[in-house]
Amino acid sequence: MSKRNQVSYVRPAEPAFLSRFKERVGYREGPTVETKKIQPQLPDEDGNESDKEDEQPQVVVLKKGDLTAEEVMKIKAEIKAAKADEEPPPADGRIMYRKPVKRSSDEKCSGLTASSKKKKTNEDDVNKQSPVRKNSQKQIKNSSLLSFGSEDENE
């Protein structure tokens, strides 16, 4: 058993005539066991290999309102500039959490409807200011409720 662990392969030197022949032909050796494990380096571009000129989609303008090729290039440049403005991730690799940016009241009400405790309390305040409307709402709600002893009272 111990002899089996001591066995190793020693690659002999390549003969001179083979090395000259391979050089003349332009032969490249395939990957070895050591080189297969190495990961290839990826280009530092934003990972958008489709940005190459021959791989871009063809722009066809059918109507006056369609985007032209120049407008598309401007939009792409704006997107790249916006990405450049963002802060790069920290060097130590830690994720930093920040408070979200507060929105103005106009943005909050732009078509979104969500119920929250504040809105409910605001509605209650409005209802307290107009008790007449509140009483009429209670009467409507009471008429829709089921009650078994109310027939004698109503008649």
Swiss-Prot record:
Pfam families: DUF4604. InterPro entries: DUF4604, KIAA1143-like. The modification N6-acetyllysine is found at K108. Residues 128-147 have a biased composition (Polar residues). Residues 43-56 have a biased composition (Acidic residues). Transmembrane segments: none annotated. This is Uncharacterized protein KIAA1143 homolog.
